[in-house]
Amino acid sequence: MICGIDEVGRGCIFGPILSAAVVFKKKPSFIKELDDSKKLKKEKREYLSSLILENSYYAFAEISNITIEKINIHNASLLAMQTAYENLKLNCSLVLVDGKFVPKITAKNVKAIIKGDSIIDEIKAASIIAKVKRDKLMDKYDKIYPLYLLKKNKGYPTKEHKNAIKKYGVLSLHRKNFKLI
């Protein structure tokens, strides 16, 4: 079994970092449609996410902004990937993670693949379901904090988001040690 893992929200200034681990039950018919979540339109991501969830074993992990502040974004990213794999509760012969660094995963073979979210189908799938899940979380937070335009910026440091922070203040879910805050 091959597991792909990716994270989203690393460059955000609001909310958690979120990762997903994906193992396909069998080679899916939609495999050629997969791509890095950042390259797909929202509708296509959501469509593919539902197909991925139906046709794979998967797990998620969220690392809070408070933990990110304590251990830094790099370590939080690795922890998110490690935790997603642990939440999967499968023993995979090969675990492929997006990026340069290998998290502490107890599998026979773990490899970091630079640009893996554009190359490896399992990582592409993890990238898609993680992005859809985090975007939905930001949409929920937007209803609570509408002045910060989280539905639009998804927690990233856009001009509008930074202006909202200046005007309305820093929220408890903002990453306070981020240089922009």
UniProtKB/Swiss-Prot annotation:
InterPro entries: RNase_HII (IPR022898), RNase_HII/HIII (IPR001352), RNase_HII/HIII_dom (IPR024567), RNaseH-like_sf (IPR012337), RNaseH_sf (IPR036397). Gene3D superfamilies: Ribonuclease H-like superfamily/Ribonuclease H. Manganese or magnesium. Binds 1 divalent metal ion per monomer in the absence of substrate. May bind a second metal ion after substrate binding. Residues 1-181 form the RNase H type-2 domain. A divalent metal cation binds at D6, E7, D98. It catalyses: Endonucleolytic cleavage to 5'-phosphomonoester. It comes from the Bacteria. GO terms for biological process: DNA replication, removal of RNA primer; mismatch repair. It is found in: Cytoplasm. The keyword 4Fe-4S does not apply. PROSITE patterns: RNASE_H_2 (PS51975). GO terms for cellular component: cytoplasm; ribonuclease H2 complex. Its EC number is 3.1.26.4. CDD domains: RNase_HII_bacteria_HII_like. GO terms for molecular function: manganese ion binding; RNA binding; RNA-DNA hybrid ribonuclease activity. Its cofactor is Mn(2+); Mg(2+). Its main location: cytoplasm. Keywords: Cytoplasm, Endonuclease, Hydrolase, Manganese, Metal-binding, Nuclease. PANTHER family: RIBONUCLEASE H2 SUBUNIT A, RIBONUCLEASE HII. Endonuclease that specifically degrades the RNA of RNA-DNA hybrids. Belongs to the RNase HII family. This is Ribonuclease HII. It comes from Borreliella burgdorferi (strain ATCC 35210 / DSM 4680 / CIP 102532 / B31) (Borrelia burgdorferi).
